């Protein structure tokens, strides 16, 4: 990757629970966009839904189990670090910390 930026996709969500649909869209994005990695950015709670069904730690654990065979998918949690649940703040944070990375927001 000399002279080129690392390509990382961002798929945000509550993953409550993580499921095959999340995995499928992730694999498609990795292949179609030639991503080096894809981050599943788990949020504490979906602001548009009521209560969560599973705890944050359970959702992170289930996400890791579901994606274990796809080495390019990484499970991340940033809300406490960036003090925000908003995607725009996450993208600002990641861009500031990773100057040599091109981020792709995956929406599905």
Give short role names for the model-derived ranges:
Residues 1-108:
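Nucleotidyltransferase catalytic core that binds NTPs
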């Amino acid at each position: 990757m000399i002279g080129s930026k690392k390509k990382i996709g961002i798929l945000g969500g509550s993953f409550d629970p993580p499921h095959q649909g999340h995995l499928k869209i992730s694999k498609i994005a990795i292949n179609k966009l030639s991503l080096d990695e894809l981050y599943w950015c788990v949020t504490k709670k979906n602001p548009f839904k009521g209560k969560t069904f599973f705890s944050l730690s359970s959702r992170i654990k289930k996400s890791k189990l579901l994606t274990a065979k796809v080495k390019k998918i990484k499970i991340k949690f940033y809300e406490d670090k960036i003090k925000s649940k908003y995607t725009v703040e996450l993208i600002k944070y990641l861009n500031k910390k990773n100057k040599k990375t091109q981020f792709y927001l995956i929406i599905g």
